[in-house]
Amino acid sequence: CIRDRASISALGKGPSTGKDCLIDKNSDKTLFRRCAVNNAAYDYYKQCQATGVTMPPKNLRFWILNILRPSSTLMMHHGALLDSKLVSKYLGKYSSLIRIFAPDITIGSRDKNGNYAELYSTTVHEMAHASHFSKVGTDYWRKYATYIITSFINTGDAYGTGNGENAGYCQVGEMWGYFMENSLYKERYGRDPGYGQNYWFAPRIFSELESGGLTRADICSCLNYYVNDLKSLKAALLENYAAKSSLINKVFKKYSR
């Protein structure tokens, strides 16, 4: 379910077999945003099928918010119980719609209108978080999302400095989100955009582990409920992939803070 300010777009009547039409940056802006997000989400599902990465939950509910640039994976429609006052501050004038259209994913499209690549990368990043949610559940997600929202409200930066309560949840989650975003962007556009490299967490850890022989599915399999900081992440990787211990130790040492 994809919503843009709780409105709908239609392409008119067509046969039950489907309808071909060209939607580009010169088309209706709302329709373009929805198509870009829909296509990116579909591509992510296909990537999960091909690589063995855990699928996001079914029936995800998207909000596309042109008033915001940041995006988020709140998973409210799937039961993540977040502080309503915090979410209201984050969503601003759309807060009154929370109870009616509890979002799983919000896509902040401000300054991205007509830019397919940015909408694509943003969407697959949030879809990677939804895969993570499938692994860890609602209690874990409440701590993670609360850290993100609180940091954004207090500082304007969703990730903070890495020192706040539950920062480790953010560390693991954003490493995974940026790793998948960069990987899928590179496969689609032929270059690594390097998103997330200047923050206090290190998505390159996963990139180098993949280059050393661990698959995305291997990495995803370690993102369980008990992995909530870099120390527990490393321990899970070593426990599950002891044959790669030399690689794991080397990479984590390289990116230790």
Language-model regions, residue ranges each:
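Conserved small/polar residues in nucleotide/adenosyl-binding loops
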Residues: 1-4
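Auxiliary, metal-adjacent structural segments of Zn-dependent hydrolase domains
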Residues: 34-102
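Second-shell loop/turn segments in exported
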Residues: 26-35, 109-114, 118, 162-168, ...
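Pan-zinc metallopeptidase signature
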Residues: 188-257
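Acidic/histidine-rich, surface-exposed loop or edge segments in extracytoplasmic proteins
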Residues: 15-30
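Post-HEXXH active-site segment of zinc metalloproteases
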Residues: 134-166
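Metalloprotease/metallohydrolase-associated module, dominated by Zn2+-dependent proteases
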Residues: 157-213
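Active-site scaffold of zinc-dependent metalloenzymes
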Residues: 75-137, 147-148
